[in-house]
Amino acid sequence: MLIAVERLLLKIGQPRSRADELIALRRRLRDERARKIDDDERALAREVLARKLAVSAELDAVSSCRSCATGAPWPRGAYDGGDCCAGVTADLFDENELAALVHAGTRVRDLAPPPGADEHAGCAFRGPRGCTLEVAHRPGRCVHYLCDTLRRELHARGQLDLVEAKLADLNRTMQQFTQVHQAGLDRDVLAPIIDAILTR
């Protein structure tokens, strides 16, 4: 009942395209949260979170991202900043990224969209004042993308090497998480088949 009300409120309060993306994402989040996972997967999800926050802390003072989309065609240019945020929500929150978020603590209540009056231009969480998600609840790829403009700014600040090293750590950890997560999904699929064979 509560999920039906939640969907109705999204459809009433948001542009249809954003509401559809949010409903699908929240459904996938609930499905992933219902999975039984092992301690290794949960520990790696928390490590992905820690490494993502470490990268984000280095990017906190950058100014490039506030105006990078100015003058770009729609949907990229709908807002001044966040050119790299103009992707499709389901692509940004792919299966592995969403699983890492869920098992590090992200819940449906953490996925708050911009006000409904704000145009849906790319990711469902992109609005005129930036992303509505706290960094902890954004996919790792949201801090992983370094465009040429941002790279130049980081180089001028003397931060580029440090940020690239932290991104490499994040990437390695996400690859480890993905391997463990995919192995868990394989077990989920194979377990009933193996049980059926063994009980014959």
Outline where the language-model segments fall.
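Hydrophobic scaffolds flanking metal-cofactor catalytic centers in soluble metalloenzymes
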Residues: 1-200
